[in-house]
Amino acid sequence: MIMCGITAIFNIHDGAQALRKQALLMSKRIRHRGPDWSGIYQGKTAILAHERLSIVDPASGGQPLVSPDGKLILCVNGEIYNHQELRERLKGDYEFQTGSDCEVILALYKKKGIDFIEDLNGIFAFALYDEEKEVYLIARDPIGVIPLYIGYDDEGHLMVSSELKGLEGFATHYEPFLPGHYFYSEDRKLTRWYTRDWMDYANVKDNPTDVQQLHDALEAAVKRQLMSDVPYGVLLSGGLDSSITSAIAKKYAAKRIETNGKADAWWPQLHSFAIGLKDAPDLIAARKVADAIGTVHHEIHYTIQEGLDALRDVIYHIETYDVTTVRASTPMYLLARVIRSMGIKMVLSGEGADEVFGGYLYFHKAPNAQAFHEETLRKLSKLYLYDCLRANKSLCAWGVEGRVPFLDKEFLDVAMRLNPVAKMCPGTTIEKKILREAFSDSLPKEIAWRQKEQFSDGVGYGWIDTLKKITSESVTDEEMANAAKRFPINPPQNKEEYYYRSIFEEHFPSESAARSVPSIPSVACSTAEALAWDSAFKNMNEPSGRAIKGVHESACLLYTSDA
């Protein structure tokens, strides 16, 4: 298992030595993602480079990985959670060289060609080069938990990089590589490999709802994702999602899941981490959860000034000017530095639950089950531009890997096939009620039924309020009036966005960089389509959960009496 950074250059016909130097420069720009080791392969028509953060098989799992016959070369950023099952199935067809979970990709390609990606349960972005056939395959995981960008230069070279900074200045044009897709050089196009029946409302509208099945599926996902040969922890904000993943992780932390619980864990004490301004809502709630489940808890305080001082570095690392993402990434970036300083290289996080279960406060306004379900689909399809990007890049800035059980491939098939009616939260019904019911026995009552806080809200309301004030004072009315002239691509809609965009442009001045960031009107993280749910939404453009008047202020503990 390797969380890392990858870069590659394909379609090389001459000048390979000069391109090797370029590949090394590209790779160096993303070395923060993998500070443990660097590797590079140069072939006839391809160069693949890798920056390694070792999590599983630290001694022999370096990359690029090479097949026993030397003809297949692979760079992977990711985790293959079902690799042991795949190894068992493939051991008669392939001679494994390492203990890396990612080597199963080579074995699968050798046996099945390009038609193997569906066999993988994991999070990944990879580039595979077939030296004998002089073809290559690039692919990305279903939801886009792992970042990847693809680009071209004027000489016709195709390039990929885990972060856009690896392509900025080298590729004439680049863009995010779409999740759930692959690019095969013989086809010369992106092809969607990840499709599901639950992507059509007609296939789920009459489904039953099994709370126990939901419980068991998430527990299995968390357990799967605990495989590690290095110390790990959990991000514990005190919200519902991180509290559930932390409670499940604690249940299994004492034993190594690689041995099916037969051997003691190498680091049996589970460490949990929370960050916020002093007395922030998240910190208070996280303490309660940590005490209840028995983690070794670490509470990190940051000041508003420390957050402001970090903004320029945060935007460089997360590669976006999206307001919500910048707000939430800053405390996570500061926390990741502390986590790494304590020797922790992997953490579980709660991203994805709000998209799967309609946990954002605006979902209260969904007019019917079909609209609700289709909005969850839209939210899932855009996660790679928002929360997945934030979680991955904020943590990887300091060489920490993040895993997200709520976006586990097998769990998604259970959760997204639930009857959407069971997920809805009409009127005063609390959001994610079915998830709360599934795990109400695992958490303190006041946590199981605590209302949704966005991460940037929960770390302390003063953080957002100060950001608005500082950015408003820093950007003049004249600058804002001329925003569309200075930034013709995705013009900023408010002064806070203008401020972040200016910093982003200093780091990444190209048009490709500007186009890589989404810019749509939003209320409390809604998609543009959901603005039609309430006429009041059309007059707002505030991504914070506090935009939903009357919902945030009410302490929504409506079910504590009978939970």
Feature roles, as predicted:
Residues 1-6, 341-348, 367, 372-561:
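Adenosyl-5′-phosphate
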Residues 2-321:
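Cysteine-centered catalytic environments shared across enzyme families
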Residues 19, 82, 98-101, 120, ...:
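Hydrophobic (often cysteine-bearing) scaffold residues that line and stabilize catalytic clefts
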Residues 30, 225, 253, 257, ...:
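A generic secondary-structure signal for well-formed alpha-helical elements
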Residues 106-107, 243-247, 336-337, 358, ...:
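Short, hydrophobic alpha-helix immediately C-terminal to the catalytic nucleophile
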Residues 127, 323-335, 377-380, 476-480:
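Short, basic, helix/turn surface patches
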Residues 211, 275-336, 362-371, 393-394, ...:
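ATP-dependent adenylate-handling ligase core
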Residues 344-354, 360:
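Short acidic/histidine-rich active-site segments
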